[in-house]
Regions:
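N-terminal beta-strand motif that seeds the catalytic metal site of vicinal oxygen chelate
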Residues: 1-24, 69, 126-133
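Long, continuous compositionally biased terminal/linker segments
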Residues: 3-4, 47-88
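Core segments of cupin and vicinal oxygen chelate
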Residues: 14-54
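Vicinal oxygen chelate
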Residues: 17-22, 70-116
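Ligand-binding pocket scaffold of soluble enzyme catalytic domains
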Residues: 38, 94-96, 113-116, 124-127, ...
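Short secondary-structure capping/turn micro-motifs that flank functional sites
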Residues: 46-49, 102-103, 128
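Short beta->alpha transition motifs characteristic of CBS
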Residues: 58, 104-105, 111, 122-129
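Glycine-rich acetyl-CoA-binding "A-motif" of GNAT/NAT acetyltransferases
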Residues: 119
Length: 133
């Protein structure tokens, strides 16, 4: 089954972080391969992503349980660059770039734990085919 390309389901996401400066540095570097633009607001920095789906961080007490957020990459090279940049920015490797066929054919992703313990993923869906059920 192929998924249609439509508007993003999520318009924006705000993530609470313990140390805004540390997290801003991490996300600026980790998301650089996506070509994000850093924007300022009264609540904290945001990362504008072409096509929608803005991502914001704001200082405060993070949720008790870690969050998993995935950023859609245009290709495998972007996934690779994200992983390298995120680890160099202080993230902890949580899954090197590679195929994850147990999700679906063509699912190419990398995972990094951010400074607050959240699981941050970059994913390229390839042909975007889902497994038959």
């Amino acid at each position: 089954m192929s998924l249609p390309v439509t508007l993003p389901l999520i318009d924006h996401l705000a993530l609470r972080v313990r140390d805004e400066r540390r997290s801003r540095t991490f996300y600026e570097r980790a998301l650089e391969p996506f070509g994000v633009e850093v924007v300022e607001s009264s609540r904290g920095p945001g990362f504008a992503i072409e096509g929608g789906g803005d991502f914001w961080i704001e200082e405060g007490e993070p949720p008790a349980a870690p969050v998993h957020v995935a950023f859609a990459a245009a290709d495998r090279a972007t996934v690779d660059k994200f992983h390298r940049a995120a680890v160099e920015a202080g993230g902890r490797d949580n899954g090197a770039p590679g195929l994850r066929p147990h999700y679906h054919a063509g699912y190419y992703a990398a995972f990094v734990i951010d400074p607050d313990g959240n699981n941050v993923e970059a994913v390229f869906h390839g042909d975007r085919q889902l497994p038959a059920t």
